């Protein structure tokens, strides 16, 4: 089995982190998230993966040069963004008659082997992974009967439970016949509805697997906390989790839900809680970092407070400054005046 991983999005809701690093390459437990996606595919016998993007392509090429082992990766350069469906159509020359599609920003422990078997057993043209949620307002609903998808419903106005598209697919090559390569296509809004309208067998694979879209800072943090809590099959880490090279002063305090990257320094009387700190971050003496994501090489000055914020690579917070609900771009310096910027 081969697979396509969709990595072309710009990750606008995760800015400013994604201004310099594409979302699939942001660290998850101190490794680029795409490693986890590829490892998951390899665990289920996938031997070749196709990636394509037009956004920050050089960063993906560096990642691929540094990655070793299965599955092997074929890279396709998109001259311009092609959308979720366009990227798949463009990859068809490299794929088998039946193949997997994963979103490069979704963390899951879904049993991919079972999903492929379900697809084949039902003679499906397309199979969509489904997750059951208590509140479908952010997603929209997928209506099924006996696992066959009947329609996609708009996001409900009121909080209602239901099944949603969880972003992993099994497709037959024939399901994409007639779609022209090289143009913008949405698999969710064009390809799937078109298949259903034509009467093609589209099925939903409902499971209780873990599922999280890493598209916002809040969900990015929550994914780390869920891993620390042991909610994902096969992923076990101590809590708090710190890289072996992290230097934490004996008088510093780390909360339970904390991840510290390579070379992080936390000074005396500093406090870090409910936060993820990427490689090279420095937290000065007496500083507090709460509910925040700090990108590579961020410096938080002595006695400064950072709460509910996202600081991009190389940002600095002056001594005694207070940062709340802020988005601080790469290399920017936040001064002693209280900085409050509502999230994007």
Predicted regions and their residues:
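Extended, small-residue-rich solenoid/repeat segments and analogous flexible loops
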Residues: 183, 196-284, 288
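Conserved N-terminal catalytic core of the sugar/cofactor nucleotidyltransferase
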Residues: 1-5, 13, 26-114, 144, ...
């Amino acid at each position: 089995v081969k697979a396509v991983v969709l990595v072309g999005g710009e990750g606008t809701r995760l800015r400013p982190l994604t201004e310099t690093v594409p979302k699939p390459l942001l660290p998850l437990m101190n490794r680029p998230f795409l490693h986890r996606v590829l490892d998951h595919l390899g665990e289920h016998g996938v031997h070749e993966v196709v990636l394509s993007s037009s956004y920050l392509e050089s960063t993906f090429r560096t990642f691929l040069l540094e990655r070793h082992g299965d599955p092997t990766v074929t890279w396709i350069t998109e001259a311009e963004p092609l959308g979720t469906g366009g990227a798949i159509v463009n990859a068809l020359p490299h794929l088998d008659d039946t193949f997997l599609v994963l979103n490069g920003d979704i963390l899951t422990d879904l049993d991919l082997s079972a999903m492929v078997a379900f697809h084949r057993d039902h003679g499906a043209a397309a199979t969509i992974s489904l997750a059951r949620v208590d509140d479908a307002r952010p997603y929209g609903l997928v209506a099924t009967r006996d696992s066959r998808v009947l329609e996609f419903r708009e996001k409900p106005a009121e909080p209602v439970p239901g099944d949603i598209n969880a972003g992993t697919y099994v497709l037959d090559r024939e399901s994409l016949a007639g779609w022209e390569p090289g143009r913008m296509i949405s698999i969710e809004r064009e390809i799937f509805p078109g298949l259903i309208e034509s009467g093609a067998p589209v099925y939903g694979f409902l499971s209780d697997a873990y599922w999280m879209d890493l598209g916002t800072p809040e969900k990015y943090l929550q994914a780390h906390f869920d891993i620390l809590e042991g909610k994902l099959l096969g992923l076990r880490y101590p809590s708090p989790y710190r890289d072996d090279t992290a230097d934490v002063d004996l008088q510093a305090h780390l909360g339970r839900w904390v991840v510290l990257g390579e070379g992080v320094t936390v000074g005396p009387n500093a406090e870090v809680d409910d936060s993820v700190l990427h490689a090279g971050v420095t937290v000065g003496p007496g500083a507090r970092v709460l509910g925040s994501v700090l990108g590579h090489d961020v410096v938080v000055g002595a006695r400064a407070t950072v709460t509910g914020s996202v600081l991009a690579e190389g940002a600095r917070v002056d001594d005694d400054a207070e940062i709340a609900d802020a988005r601080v771009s790469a290399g920017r310096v936040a001064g002693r005046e209280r900085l409050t910027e509502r999230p994007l």
